[in-house]
Regions:
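Cytoplasmic helix-loop-helix junction between adjacent transmembrane helices
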Residues: 112-156
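Helix-loop boundary and gating motifs at the non-cytosolic
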Residues: 6-64, 230-274
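Transmembrane alpha-helix termini and helix-breaking/packing motifs in multi-pass membrane transporters
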Residues: 43, 159-181, 255-264, 289-290, ...
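C-terminal ends and interior cores of transmembrane alpha-helices
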Residues: 83, 87-103, 306-319
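Juxtamembrane intracellular "pre-TM" segments in multi-pass secondary transporters
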Residues: 2-13, 197-236, 425-428, 432-433
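Hydrophobic core of transmembrane alpha-helices in multi-pass small-molecule transporters
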Residues: 24, 92, 104-123, 323-337
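Helix-loop junctions on the cytosolic side of multi-pass membrane transporters
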Residues: 181, 189-210, 406-417
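Transmembrane alpha-helices of Major Facilitator/SLC transporters
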Residues: 61-64, 271-292
Protein backbone atom coordinates (compact mmCIF):
# COMPACT_ATOMS: atom_id res chain seq x y z
CA UNK A 1 0.00 0.00 0.00
CA UNK A 2 2.78 2.41 0.87
CA UNK A 3 4.69 1.80 -2.36
CA UNK A 4 1.55 2.33 -4.42
CA UNK A 5 0.68 5.52 -2.61
CA UNK A 6 4.14 6.90 -3.15
CA UNK A 7 4.03 5.94 -6.84
CA UNK A 8 0.82 7.93 -7.24
CA UNK A 9 2.29 10.93 -5.47
CA UNK A 10 5.89 11.65 -6.56
CA UNK A 11 5.71 14.93 -4.66
CA UNK A 12 5.52 12.84 -1.47
CA UNK A 13 8.81 11.18 -2.36
CA UNK A 14 10.39 14.57 -2.95
CA UNK A 15 9.11 15.81 0.40
CA UNK A 16 10.43 12.76 2.24
CA UNK A 17 13.79 12.99 0.45
CA UNK A 18 13.98 16.67 1.40
CA UNK A 19 13.18 15.81 5.01
CA UNK A 20 15.93 13.18 5.17
CA UNK A 21 18.42 15.52 3.50
CA UNK A 22 17.73 18.50 5.74
CA UNK A 23 17.55 16.47 8.96
CA UNK A 24 20.79 14.68 8.09
CA UNK A 25 22.70 17.83 7.14
CA UNK A 26 21.43 19.70 10.18
CA UNK A 27 22.46 16.89 12.53
CA UNK A 28 25.83 16.54 10.80
CA UNK A 29 26.45 20.24 11.37
CA UNK A 30 25.27 20.26 14.97
CA UNK A 31 27.19 17.09 15.91
CA UNK A 32 30.54 18.49 14.77
CA UNK A 33 31.11 20.02 18.23
CA UNK A 34 29.33 17.53 20.48
CA UNK A 35 32.38 15.37 21.11
CA UNK A 36 34.70 18.28 21.93
CA UNK A 37 32.46 20.90 23.54
CA UNK A 38 33.57 20.33 27.13
CA UNK A 39 37.23 20.18 26.12
CA UNK A 40 36.80 23.42 24.15
CA UNK A 41 35.30 25.25 27.12
CA UNK A 42 37.99 23.98 29.48
CA UNK A 43 40.65 25.07 26.99
CA UNK A 44 38.95 28.49 26.83
CA UNK A 45 39.72 28.96 30.52
CA UNK A 46 36.51 27.86 32.22
CA UNK A 47 36.67 25.67 35.31
CA UNK A 48 34.87 22.33 35.41
CA UNK A 49 31.98 23.91 37.32
CA UNK A 50 31.82 26.91 34.98
CA UNK A 51 31.55 24.59 31.97
CA UNK A 52 28.30 23.25 33.37
CA UNK A 53 27.05 26.70 34.32
CA UNK A 54 27.37 27.56 30.62
CA UNK A 55 25.64 24.30 29.66
CA UNK A 56 22.89 24.96 32.20
CA UNK A 57 22.36 28.36 30.57
CA UNK A 58 21.66 26.48 27.34
CA UNK A 59 19.04 24.35 29.11
CA UNK A 60 17.52 27.50 30.60
CA UNK A 61 17.37 28.99 27.12
CA UNK A 62 15.41 26.02 25.80
CA UNK A 63 12.90 26.46 28.62
CA UNK A 64 12.67 30.19 27.93
CA UNK A 65 12.26 30.01 24.15
CA UNK A 66 10.42 26.72 23.59
CA UNK A 67 6.90 28.16 23.49
CA UNK A 68 7.63 31.54 21.79
CA UNK A 69 9.51 29.89 18.91
CA UNK A 70 6.69 27.40 18.55
CA UNK A 71 4.31 30.32 18.07
CA UNK A 72 6.60 31.63 15.31
CA UNK A 73 6.49 28.28 13.48
CA UNK A 74 2.71 28.10 13.83
CA UNK A 75 2.17 31.61 12.45
CA UNK A 76 4.99 32.86 10.22
CA UNK A 77 5.60 29.34 8.95
CA UNK A 78 7.78 26.25 9.36
CA UNK A 79 10.18 27.41 6.61
CA UNK A 80 10.84 30.75 8.32
CA UNK A 81 11.36 28.98 11.65
CA UNK A 82 13.85 26.49 10.18
CA UNK A 83 15.83 29.17 8.34
CA UNK A 84 15.91 31.25 11.53
CA UNK A 85 17.26 28.23 13.40
CA UNK A 86 20.10 27.71 10.94
CA UNK A 87 21.00 31.41 10.94
CA UNK A 88 20.99 31.85 14.72
CA UNK A 89 22.85 28.58 15.31
CA UNK A 90 25.60 29.46 12.82
CA UNK A 91 26.01 32.93 14.34
CA UNK A 92 26.04 31.70 17.94
CA UNK A 93 28.63 29.04 17.07
CA UNK A 94 30.94 31.74 15.71
CA UNK A 95 30.26 33.78 18.86
CA UNK A 96 31.61 30.84 20.90
CA UNK A 97 34.85 30.90 18.91
CA UNK A 98 35.19 34.64 19.37
CA UNK A 99 34.59 34.41 23.11
CA UNK A 100 37.32 31.79 23.44
CA UNK A 101 39.78 34.01 21.59
CA UNK A 102 39.33 36.87 24.08
CA UNK A 103 39.09 34.69 27.24
CA UNK A 104 35.62 36.10 27.83
CA UNK A 105 34.68 34.12 30.93
CA UNK A 106 31.68 32.14 32.12
CA UNK A 107 29.09 34.94 31.98
CA UNK A 108 29.76 35.62 28.31
CA UNK A 109 29.74 31.91 27.46
CA UNK A 110 26.45 31.51 29.33
CA UNK A 111 24.95 34.30 27.21
CA UNK A 112 26.29 32.58 24.09
CA UNK A 113 24.71 29.32 25.22
CA UNK A 114 21.31 31.01 25.60
CA UNK A 115 21.66 32.34 22.05
CA UNK A 116 22.52 28.83 20.85
CA UNK A 117 19.43 27.49 22.61
CA UNK A 118 17.32 30.02 20.71
CA UNK A 119 18.66 28.56 17.47
CA UNK A 120 17.78 25.00 18.40
CA UNK A 121 14.28 25.85 19.64
CA UNK A 122 13.46 27.41 16.27
CA UNK A 123 14.21 23.95 14.81
CA UNK A 124 12.40 21.59 17.19
CA UNK A 125 8.99 20.68 15.88
CA UNK A 126 9.16 22.89 12.78
CA UNK A 127 10.71 20.17 10.63
CA UNK A 128 8.23 17.48 11.68
CA UNK A 129 5.26 19.82 11.26
CA UNK A 130 6.51 20.80 7.78
CA UNK A 131 6.83 17.14 6.80
CA UNK A 132 3.37 16.16 8.03
CA UNK A 133 1.70 19.20 6.44
CA UNK A 134 3.40 18.57 3.08
CA UNK A 135 2.61 14.85 3.03
CA UNK A 136 -1.03 15.50 3.85
CA UNK A 137 -1.28 18.04 1.03
CA UNK A 138 0.29 15.58 -1.44
CA UNK A 139 -2.15 12.79 -0.60
CA UNK A 140 0.38 10.50 1.06
CA UNK A 141 -1.30 7.58 2.88
CA UNK A 142 1.72 5.67 4.19
CA UNK A 143 2.70 5.05 7.79
CA UNK A 144 4.32 8.11 9.31
CA UNK A 145 6.21 6.05 11.85
CA UNK A 146 8.27 4.43 9.08
CA UNK A 147 9.23 7.83 7.72
CA UNK A 148 10.27 9.01 11.19
CA UNK A 149 12.11 5.76 11.91
CA UNK A 150 14.14 6.04 8.70
CA UNK A 151 14.74 9.69 9.49
CA UNK A 152 16.18 8.66 12.85
CA UNK A 153 18.53 6.26 11.06
CA UNK A 154 19.67 9.10 8.80
CA UNK A 155 20.30 11.45 11.73
CA UNK A 156 22.03 8.67 13.66
CA UNK A 157 24.46 8.14 10.79
CA UNK A 158 24.94 11.90 10.52
CA UNK A 159 25.74 12.10 14.22
CA UNK A 160 28.35 9.36 13.83
CA UNK A 161 30.02 11.20 10.97
CA UNK A 162 29.78 14.56 12.71
CA UNK A 163 31.21 13.50 16.05
CA UNK A 164 34.07 11.48 14.56
CA UNK A 165 34.87 14.25 12.08
CA UNK A 166 34.68 16.86 14.82
CA UNK A 167 37.05 14.86 16.99
CA UNK A 168 39.58 14.56 14.18
CA UNK A 169 39.32 18.28 13.37
CA UNK A 170 39.74 19.04 17.07
CA UNK A 171 43.17 17.42 16.94
CA UNK A 172 44.22 20.34 14.72
CA UNK A 173 42.65 22.97 16.96
CA UNK A 174 39.62 22.82 19.22
CA UNK A 175 38.03 25.78 17.43
CA UNK A 176 38.09 24.10 14.00
CA UNK A 177 34.97 21.93 14.60
CA UNK A 178 33.05 25.11 15.46
CA UNK A 179 34.15 26.82 12.26
CA UNK A 180 33.26 23.68 10.30
CA UNK A 181 29.81 23.64 11.89
CA UNK A 182 29.10 27.22 10.83
CA UNK A 183 30.26 26.49 7.28
CA UNK A 184 28.05 23.39 7.06
CA UNK A 185 25.09 25.38 8.34
CA UNK A 186 25.50 27.80 5.44
CA UNK A 187 25.07 24.82 3.12
CA UNK A 188 22.00 23.71 5.09
CA UNK A 189 20.51 27.19 4.68
CA UNK A 190 21.02 27.06 0.92
CA UNK A 191 19.40 23.62 0.60
CA UNK A 192 16.47 24.55 2.86
CA UNK A 193 15.87 27.79 0.97
CA UNK A 194 15.59 25.79 -2.25
CA UNK A 195 13.55 22.74 -1.19
CA UNK A 196 11.59 23.71 1.93
CA UNK A 197 8.30 25.50 1.25
CA UNK A 198 5.15 25.69 3.35
CA UNK A 199 2.82 23.29 1.52
CA UNK A 200 -0.43 22.42 3.24
CA UNK A 201 0.06 25.27 5.71
CA UNK A 202 -0.74 28.95 5.22
CA UNK A 203 1.58 31.30 7.13
CA UNK A 204 -0.01 34.33 8.72
CA UNK A 205 1.33 37.46 10.29
CA UNK A 206 1.26 37.72 14.05
CA UNK A 207 1.35 41.30 15.36
CA UNK A 208 3.84 41.75 18.18
CA UNK A 209 1.06 42.82 20.52
CA UNK A 210 -0.65 39.43 20.06
CA UNK A 211 2.47 37.36 20.83
CA UNK A 212 2.09 37.37 24.66
CA UNK A 213 -1.52 36.17 24.39
CA UNK A 214 -0.51 33.40 21.98
CA UNK A 215 2.24 32.26 24.35
CA UNK A 216 -0.18 32.19 27.29
CA UNK A 217 -2.70 30.20 25.24
CA UNK A 218 -0.09 27.59 24.31
CA UNK A 219 1.13 27.35 27.91
CA UNK A 220 -2.41 26.81 29.20
CA UNK A 221 -3.01 24.10 26.62
CA UNK A 222 0.21 22.39 27.71
CA UNK A 223 -1.02 22.31 31.28
CA UNK A 224 -4.59 21.28 30.46
CA UNK A 225 -3.76 18.46 28.04
CA UNK A 226 -0.42 17.43 29.55
CA UNK A 227 0.42 18.22 33.15
CA UNK A 228 -3.20 17.85 34.29
CA UNK A 229 -3.24 14.20 33.19
CA UNK A 230 -1.64 12.12 35.93
CA UNK A 231 0.22 9.56 33.77
CA UNK A 232 1.66 12.32 31.58
CA UNK A 233 2.64 14.32 34.67
CA UNK A 234 4.45 11.30 36.14
CA UNK A 235 6.33 10.69 32.89
CA UNK A 236 7.29 14.37 32.73
CA UNK A 237 8.63 14.27 36.28
CA UNK A 238 10.64 11.13 35.51
CA UNK A 239 12.09 12.80 32.41
CA UNK A 240 12.94 15.93 34.41
CA UNK A 241 14.82 13.82 36.94
CA UNK A 242 16.68 11.75 34.35
CA UNK A 243 17.48 14.69 32.07
CA UNK A 244 19.14 16.51 34.96
CA UNK A 245 21.70 13.70 35.13
CA UNK A 246 22.02 12.71 31.48
CA UNK A 247 22.65 16.21 30.14
CA UNK A 248 25.46 16.61 32.66
CA UNK A 249 26.76 13.07 32.17
CA UNK A 250 27.04 13.35 28.39
CA UNK A 251 29.46 16.27 28.55
CA UNK A 252 31.19 15.24 31.78
CA UNK A 253 32.11 11.88 30.25
CA UNK A 254 34.47 13.55 27.74
CA UNK A 255 37.19 14.74 30.16
CA UNK A 256 36.39 11.95 32.64
CA UNK A 257 37.16 9.14 30.20
CA UNK A 258 40.29 10.90 28.93
CA UNK A 259 41.51 11.15 32.53
CA UNK A 260 40.89 7.44 33.08
CA UNK A 261 42.74 6.67 29.86
CA UNK A 262 45.51 9.09 30.89
CA UNK A 263 45.38 10.67 27.44
CA UNK A 264 44.71 14.07 25.92
CA UNK A 265 43.84 12.76 22.44
CA UNK A 266 40.84 14.80 21.32
CA UNK A 267 39.92 12.22 18.66
CA UNK A 268 39.16 9.72 21.45
CA UNK A 269 36.37 11.99 22.71
CA UNK A 270 34.93 12.12 19.20
CA UNK A 271 35.01 8.35 18.81
CA UNK A 272 33.41 7.86 22.24
CA UNK A 273 30.62 10.27 21.30
CA UNK A 274 30.10 8.32 18.08
CA UNK A 275 29.92 5.16 20.20
CA UNK A 276 27.22 6.84 22.26
CA UNK A 277 25.23 7.37 19.07
CA UNK A 278 25.65 3.71 18.11
CA UNK A 279 24.63 2.50 21.56
CA UNK A 280 21.52 4.67 21.44
CA UNK A 281 20.62 3.20 18.06
CA UNK A 282 21.15 -0.25 19.56
CA UNK A 283 18.70 0.70 22.30
CA UNK A 284 16.20 1.68 19.59
CA UNK A 285 16.56 -1.79 18.09
CA UNK A 286 15.97 -3.36 21.51
CA UNK A 287 12.59 -1.63 21.47
CA UNK A 288 11.90 -3.01 18.01
CA UNK A 289 12.61 -6.58 19.13
CA UNK A 290 11.40 -6.52 22.74
CA UNK A 291 8.05 -4.98 21.85
CA UNK A 292 7.23 -8.17 19.92
CA UNK A 293 7.25 -10.13 23.16
CA UNK A 294 6.64 -7.52 25.86
CA UNK A 295 3.02 -6.57 26.51
CA UNK A 296 3.51 -3.33 28.43
CA UNK A 297 5.53 -0.21 27.76
CA UNK A 298 6.15 0.31 31.47
CA UNK A 299 7.97 -3.04 31.59
CA UNK A 300 10.53 -1.65 29.15
CA UNK A 301 10.68 1.68 31.00
CA UNK A 302 11.30 0.05 34.39
CA UNK A 303 13.87 -2.40 33.04
CA UNK A 304 15.85 0.22 31.13
CA UNK A 305 15.75 2.73 33.99
CA UNK A 306 17.07 0.13 36.45
CA UNK A 307 19.94 -0.79 34.13
CA UNK A 308 20.79 2.89 33.67
CA UNK A 309 21.03 3.51 37.40
CA UNK A 310 23.39 0.56 37.91
CA UNK A 311 25.52 1.54 34.90
CA UNK A 312 25.85 5.14 36.12
CA UNK A 313 27.04 4.03 39.56
CA UNK A 314 29.58 1.62 38.02
CA UNK A 315 30.79 4.41 35.74
CA UNK A 316 31.46 6.61 38.75
CA UNK A 317 33.09 3.96 40.93
CA UNK A 318 35.50 2.36 38.47
CA UNK A 319 39.05 3.54 37.90
CA UNK A 320 39.40 1.62 34.64
CA UNK A 321 38.68 3.18 31.26
CA UNK A 322 37.78 -0.24 29.85
CA UNK A 323 35.12 -0.74 32.52
CA UNK A 324 33.82 2.83 32.34
CA UNK A 325 33.41 2.78 28.56
CA UNK A 326 30.94 -0.14 28.33
CA UNK A 327 29.13 1.24 31.40
CA UNK A 328 28.67 4.53 29.55
CA UNK A 329 27.43 2.75 26.43
CA UNK A 330 25.01 0.68 28.52
CA UNK A 331 23.75 3.91 30.08
CA UNK A 332 23.12 5.54 26.71
CA UNK A 333 21.62 2.37 25.23
CA UNK A 334 19.03 2.73 27.98
CA UNK A 335 18.23 6.17 26.60
CA UNK A 336 17.54 4.52 23.27
CA UNK A 337 14.95 2.35 25.00
CA UNK A 338 13.34 4.84 27.39
CA UNK A 339 13.10 7.69 24.88
CA UNK A 340 10.95 6.11 22.14
CA UNK A 341 8.84 4.02 24.54
CA UNK A 342 8.05 7.06 26.65
CA UNK A 343 7.33 9.08 23.50
CA UNK A 344 4.95 6.41 22.22
CA UNK A 345 3.10 6.37 25.56
CA UNK A 346 2.68 10.14 25.48
CA UNK A 347 1.42 10.16 21.89
CA UNK A 348 -1.28 7.63 22.81
CA UNK A 349 -2.70 10.03 25.42
CA UNK A 350 -2.37 13.43 23.75
CA UNK A 351 -5.14 14.65 21.40
CA UNK A 352 -3.75 15.09 17.89
CA UNK A 353 -4.53 18.81 17.75
CA UNK A 354 -2.68 19.39 21.05
CA UNK A 355 0.24 17.05 20.39
CA UNK A 356 2.88 19.65 19.51
CA UNK A 357 1.86 21.95 22.36
CA UNK A 358 2.15 19.20 24.98
CA UNK A 359 5.45 17.95 23.53
CA UNK A 360 6.74 21.52 23.78
CA UNK A 361 5.60 21.72 27.41
CA UNK A 362 7.25 18.36 28.09
CA UNK A 363 10.50 19.70 26.66
CA UNK A 364 10.28 22.70 28.98
CA UNK A 365 9.91 20.48 32.04
CA UNK A 366 12.87 18.35 30.96
CA UNK A 367 14.93 21.47 30.31
CA UNK A 368 14.27 22.67 33.84
CA UNK A 369 15.75 19.41 35.11
CA UNK A 370 18.77 19.97 32.89
CA UNK A 371 19.42 23.35 34.49
CA UNK A 372 19.42 22.03 38.06
CA UNK A 373 21.27 18.82 37.29
CA UNK A 374 24.13 20.44 35.41
CA UNK A 375 24.72 23.14 38.02
CA UNK A 376 24.43 20.78 40.98
CA UNK A 377 26.46 17.89 39.59
CA UNK A 378 28.97 20.31 38.07
CA UNK A 379 29.58 21.83 41.50
CA UNK A 380 29.89 18.38 43.09
CA UNK A 381 32.27 17.23 40.37
CA UNK A 382 34.57 20.17 41.02
CA UNK A 383 34.34 20.02 44.83
CA UNK A 384 34.72 16.24 45.18
CA UNK A 385 35.32 14.34 41.95
CA UNK A 386 33.61 13.64 38.65
CA UNK A 387 33.29 9.99 39.67
CA UNK A 388 31.44 10.96 42.85
CA UNK A 389 29.07 13.11 40.80
CA UNK A 390 28.35 10.16 38.50
CA UNK A 391 27.49 8.02 41.53
CA UNK A 392 25.22 10.65 43.09
CA UNK A 393 23.56 11.45 39.77
CA UNK A 394 23.09 7.77 39.00
CA UNK A 395 21.46 7.15 42.36
CA UNK A 396 19.19 10.14 41.77
CA UNK A 397 17.90 8.56 38.56
CA UNK A 398 16.54 5.71 40.68
CA UNK A 399 13.80 8.17 41.59
CA UNK A 400 12.30 7.53 38.16
CA UNK A 401 11.54 3.91 39.09
CA UNK A 402 8.64 4.62 41.50
CA UNK A 403 7.24 7.14 39.00
CA UNK A 404 7.25 4.54 36.22
CA UNK A 405 5.80 2.05 38.70
CA UNK A 406 2.92 4.41 39.48
CA UNK A 407 2.21 4.75 35.76
CA UNK A 408 2.18 0.96 35.45
CA UNK A 409 -0.35 0.60 38.26
CA UNK A 410 -2.69 2.98 36.44
CA UNK A 411 -2.91 0.58 33.49
CA UNK A 412 -4.84 1.72 30.45
CA UNK A 413 -4.52 1.13 26.73
CA UNK A 414 -1.57 3.53 26.42
CA UNK A 415 0.56 1.01 28.33
CA UNK A 416 -0.30 -1.78 25.90
CA UNK A 417 2.13 -2.48 23.05
CA UNK A 418 0.56 -3.32 19.70
CA UNK A 419 3.09 -6.03 18.92
CA UNK A 420 2.80 -9.18 16.85
CA UNK A 421 0.38 -10.70 19.34
CA UNK A 422 -2.05 -7.92 18.53
CA UNK A 423 -1.74 -8.55 14.82
CA UNK A 424 0.02 -5.25 14.16
CA UNK A 425 3.55 -4.05 13.81
CA UNK A 426 5.53 -3.42 16.96
CA UNK A 427 6.36 0.06 18.16
CA UNK A 428 8.88 1.79 15.96
CA UNK A 429 12.29 2.87 17.21
CA UNK A 430 11.40 6.48 16.62
CA UNK A 431 8.71 6.30 19.27
CA UNK A 432 5.76 7.21 17.04
CA UNK A 433 2.87 4.76 17.55
CA UNK A 434 2.54 2.16 14.82
CA UNK A 435 -1.05 3.26 14.28
CA UNK A 436 0.07 6.77 13.37
CA UNK A 437 -1.05 7.21 9.78
CA UNK A 438 -1.99 10.16 7.64
CA UNK A 439 -5.77 10.33 7.15
CA UNK A 440 -6.39 7.47 9.57
CA UNK A 441 -9.06 7.63 12.24
CA UNK A 442 -7.52 5.29 14.79
CA UNK A 443 -6.47 6.21 18.30
CA UNK A 444 -3.01 7.74 18.31
CA UNK A 445 -3.28 9.21 14.82
CA UNK A 446 -1.23 12.12 13.64
CA UNK A 447 -3.61 14.57 12.01
CA UNK A 448 -1.45 16.39 9.49
CA UNK A 449 -4.06 18.97 8.65
CA UNK A 450 -3.81 20.19 12.23
CA UNK A 451 -0.12 19.62 12.73
CA UNK A 452 1.54 22.35 14.72
CA UNK A 453 5.15 22.99 15.57
CA UNK A 454 6.60 22.75 19.02
CA UNK A 455 9.23 25.34 19.78
Amino acid sequence: MIAGAEARAPESRRTIAGYYTLAGLYTLSAAAIWGVNTLFLLDAGLSFFEVFVANAAYSFGTVLFEVPTGVVADTLGRRISFLASVTVLAASTLVYVGLAEVDAGVVAFAAGSVLMALGFTFYTGAMEAWLVDSLAASGYVGLLDRVFARGQQVTGAAMLAGTIGGGLLGQVDLSVPYLARSALLLAVFAVAFAVMHDVGFTPRRLPARELPAAIVTNARAGVAFGWAQRPIRLLMLAACLETGFFMWGFYASQPYLLDLLESDAVWVAGVVTAGIALSTIAGNQVVQVASRFCGKRTTLLLSAAGVQTVAAVVLGLTESFWVALPALFLLTAGLGVVGPVRQAYLHQLIPSEQRATVVSFDSMVSGAGGVGGQVGLGALGEARSVGAAFVVGGLATAGALPLFGAVRRMGGSADEIAGERAGAECSSPSGIPAVAMVESTTVGEVAPSRATASG
